[in-house]
UniProtKB/Swiss-Prot annotation:
Chain residues that bind Mn(2+) 1: 14, 347-348
SUPFAM superfamilies found in the cross-reference section: Alkaline phosphatase-like, DeoB insert domain-like
Compartments where found: Cytoplasm
Organism listed in the record: Lactococcus lactis subsp. lactis (strain IL1403) (Streptococcus lactis)
Its job: Isomerase that catalyzes the conversion of deoxy-ribose 1-phosphate (dRib-1-P) and ribose 1-phosphate (Rib-1-P) to deoxy-ribose 5-phosphate (dRib-5-P) and ribose 5-phosphate (Rib-5-P), respectively.
Pfam families named in the record: Metalloenzyme
Sorted UniProt keywords: Cytoplasm, Isomerase, Manganese, Metal-binding
UniProt-listed InterPro entries: Alkaline_phosphatase_core_sf, DeoB, Metalloenzyme, Phosphopentomutase_DeoB_cap_sf
Gene Ontology cellular-component annotations: cytosol
Protein's name according to its UniProt entry: Phosphopentomutase
Coiled coil: none
BP GO terms, sorted: 2-deoxyribose 1-phosphate catabolic process; 5-phosphoribose 1-diphosphate biosynthetic process; metabolic compound salvage; nucleotide metabolic process
PANTHER family attached to this UniProt entry: PHOSPHOPENTOMUTASE
EC top class, as a word: isomerase
């Protein structure tokens, strides 16, 4: 079967969920003050931002964001009379609401064993190994689930004085190392993270989903995390559609932290890490306009929605970030070829109005646009992996573990 689309561009608006998933009662956030566990059944990232702050997103509105099936309509994103794109929402079947699980399922994997988390912090023997390798002590009081901004507020001044490492975790399967760039260089931080990655792989006794380098700068009371973040992920446990495309000789482009999330597996061309989401759009545009990129697949992650606004429960900042992205959509559409396909989605929720600071278990929105499509409509609710199954069918490779293609529905 000949390709329907010469190029497919997949953009993940990290954490931009669109309402509680059917199994949200099994996933929890913890009240920051009382530590009470509250399930995610009332979470609704886009819905609550639209209601509390309001959203002025004319381009997403025209594409059909307001037409995505919901129990109640978005307050400030009205339905389009004739949406310019196919739209729907997708449900996650994997047993997790973290970045890796979401992206890996989008690329066709079914993760039924959740990645281990460490709510009590990391074991002493692991910390001792890191100390021995790095030659630096670790601040034990930080070794627990912590907000990334709060942990540097609380321990940054001490790190500036002593040079000790700040190692902390979250509700996600991550080990994060915060390092002030005046005390610990990025190069040293990355080397430490690479070591930690090497001793926490599957079968090592303590498996960790991602090791994250978190450099920051500034003075006490005014610390700021920089764009030097690096994620050191496990390699996917099975072959994803991204890897299948790569092995079939189809060009694959990574923008933002996609390459990190898949540990580079399946990525042919890495457009680099984003300084911020607007820089991420710039990098996507640079990939799309490369003369040699005539056929293939680009995969973009825009992380600021999640990292800067979702975890910090910043409704205003989150809404503004969505509007900023909406303002860039005409540029993306303008450089699309007639047979390009653009898909805009998310990987989980992170309702900035919700209790706690963790991700929320939500449906993700899906917008599917091409200049060649004649009759866009609302598609049935599907699953995350339907995206990769569609990509796979378009490029004549086998789908991964799960997912059903909707390629034939696009006319």
């Amino acid at each position: 079967m000949p390709k329907k689309f010469g190029r497919i561009h997949l953009v993940v608006m990290d954490s931009v969920g669109i309402g509680a998933a059917p199994d949200a009662d099994k996933f929890f956030n913890h009240d920051v003050e009382t530590h009470e566990a509250i399930n995610d059944v009332n979470s609704d990232t886009i819905g609550h931002i639209s209601e509390i702050r309001g959203l002025d997103v004319p381009n997403l509105q025209k594409l059909g964001w307001g037409n995505i099936p919901r129990e109640s309509p978005l307050k400030t994103v009205p339905k389009a009379d004739k949406p310019a794109a196919y739209v729907t929402k997708l449900e996650e079947i994997s047993k997790g609401k973290d970045t890796m699980t979401g992206h890996w399922e989008i690329m066709g994997l079914n993760i039924q064993t959740p990645f281990p988390t460490y709510p009590e912090g990391y074991p002493e023997d692991l910390l001792e190994k890191i100390e021995e390798f790095s030659g630096r002590k670790i601040i034990r009081e930080a070794n627990k689930p912590y907000s990334g901004t709060a942990v540097i507020e609380d321990f940054g001044p001490r790190q500036l004085e002593t040079g000790e490492l700040i190692i902390y975790t979250s509700a996600d399967p991550v080990l994060q190392i915060a390092a002030h760039e005046d005390v610990i260089s990025r190069e040293e931080l990355y080397k430490i993270c690479e070591y930690v990655r090497s001793i926490t792989l599957e079968g090592s006794g303590i498996m960790i989903g991602r090791i994250i380098a978190r450099p920051y700068v500034g003075e006490a009371g005014n610390f700021e995390r920089t764009d030097g973040r690096r994620d050191y992920a496990l390699s996917p446990f099975a072959e994803t559609v991204l890897e299948k495309l790569y092995k079939a000789g189809i060009d694959t482009y990574s923008v933002g932290k996609i390459s990190d999330i898949f540990n580079t597996v399946g990525v042919k061309y890495d457009m680099g890490h984003n300084h911020n989401d607007m820089d991420g759009v710039d990098r996507l545009l640079k990939a799309m306009t490369k003369a040699e990129f005539t056929e293939g697949f680009s995969f973009t992650n825009l992380v600021d929605f999640d990292a800067k606004y979702g975890h910090r429960r910043d409704v205003e900042g989150y809404g503004k970030a969505i509007e900023d992205f909406d303002g860039r959509l005409p540029e993306i559409i303008d450089v699309m070829k007639e047979d390009d396909l653009l898909m805009i989605t998310a990987d989980h929720g992170n309702d900035p109005s919700y209790v706690g600071t963790d991700h929320t278990r939500e449906y993700i929105p899906l917008v599917i646009f091409s200049k060649s499509l004649k009759d866009p409509k609302v598609l049935p609710v599907g699953h995350f992996a339907d995206i990769s199954a569609t990509v796979a069918e378009n490029f004549s490779v086998k789908k991964a573990q799960t997912g059903e293609s909707f390629l034939d529905a696009l006319v």
